[in-house]
């Protein structure tokens, strides 16, 4: 059995920065504990990555809160999460979901029967980047078991954590 952990956007701006929430702060210990249950070669992380022109982008026009500008403190992964990740692969993504991540998972599982493959997803924000990546991965790897650990996720607002129901409807297991 090959099991991969994907840690989505555990960045300072989403935890205690410009888009931070108490719920995001509350999951940091759970996220670190989860990372520590995996070997580092089975852990991937994403980093929301924007440029200085963020407010002129479609996302910036719809969410006019500057965040995760490449190279800033807010863009960096939480220091404790980064330490737990060790040498895990971290990929920048310019949008909510990452096709590059899905392609990497296809390569990770190449030659293995789908029933011997599993992906677990944790991180921020449940209702934007977690759900986007989960659905891209499910579309790209429809027979691979994909799960989300709700105790290691937080939404933009407590009620938007309801994105977990959307994922369940798309055959993503929520724990």
Regions found by a protein language model. Name each.
Residues 90-132, 155-175:
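Conserved N-terminal glycine/acidic-rich loop preference
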Residues 85, 105, 109, 140-141:
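Active-site catalytic pocket residues across diverse enzymes, especially alpha/beta-hydrolases
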Residues 32-36, 131-141:
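Histidine-anchored nucleotide/phosphate-binding helix
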Residues 1-90, 111-114, 156, 161-169, ...:
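Active-site acidic carboxylates
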Residues 44-47, 145-152:
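Short internal beta-strands
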Residues 41, 117, 144:
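Short acidic/polar active-site loop segments enriched in Thr and Asp
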Residues 143-145, 173:
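Residue-level detector of anion-binding/catalytic polar loops
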Residues 126, 141, 150-153:
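Short leucine-rich amphipathic alpha-helical surface patches
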